[in-house]
Amino acid sequence: MRAIIAALLCLCACQTAASQAIPLRYGQAYSALRSIFALPLFVAEREGYFVREGLDFSMVPVPGGGERLIWALHDGTADMSHVATAFLVQAALAGSDAVAVVAEFNNPIYSLVAKPENKSYADLKGKLIGVAAETGSITASIRKLLALNGLQRDDYRTRFVDGTPDRLACLTTGDCDAVPLGQPHDFVAMRRGFRLLGLSTDAVPEYLYTVTAARRSWAAANKDTVVRYVRALASAFKFIRDSARRAEVLKTIVDTTGFSQANAELTLALYFEPDRRVLPKAGEISINGMEQAIALMGESGAIKAPLPTAERFIDLQYLQAAGIQ
């Protein structure tokens, strides 16, 4: 009888906690919802880290490009958003008070994959390359990779193709001669006979790629919520990095992205064997990584000199309050 009473009390306590959970809407691009870039969020959901922190977390699909993820913070669609640093910087320079509160991905690895007949960079001269947003860091890094291998902007044509899945389709249908692909779509393409020419990391130093952003005004008014979110995400990063949890992480990747088991294994091996610092240890923000992202934007012409300081786009108080940084 005592055991039954204890169980009922526990159930009531859990229901009360759930009813008092703080709602938190997180904006995520449609193109990233079933990608590796959503992994930390899905792990935090599946492992109950948001619930543990007293958050009623929901992921809100946001159509459009990176700019729209910032707009979602201003039009009431989302409280926080996944966003690439390039779009955050441009929005802040245009007057947004959006700021990075925790890192999601560093040092992304994009493969430049081409049709089989393109055996070298020289073979891409005059060809069509499907690229991500012109002002984004993916395109900047791929243009730099091409330049390092003898191809200047006038040597090839480009077409905007948003998202790795659509770029893979552009390649496989024959519309594009080469495209940058993230994981595991690069593995898929190579298994189909397409040719790897190089990696974005061959051309650019490590930089801060994606972050969770919030408006300064909203974050300041909801500091406890932001800190709870940061703690939950930190737990997810630690879980992903724990080799003893590898099978569970692989299952999450397969279930949420549609990757095959083999491609999920290849992706984690690429990231962690050896550790290429693609994911932060606990969501910490690298000031140097943000500086490198800004420098890359300057090199690509996305922003003009004098370049802004990294601190303008980062607010570390939430990571500090969570005991992470």
Task: Name these PLM-found stretches.
Residues 1-4:
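Positively charged n-region of N-terminal signal peptides that target proteins for export
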Residues 9-17:
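Hydrophobic h-region of N-terminal signal peptides that target proteins for export
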Residues 291-325:
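Conserved C-terminal helix/tail region of periplasmic/extracytoplasmic solute-binding proteins
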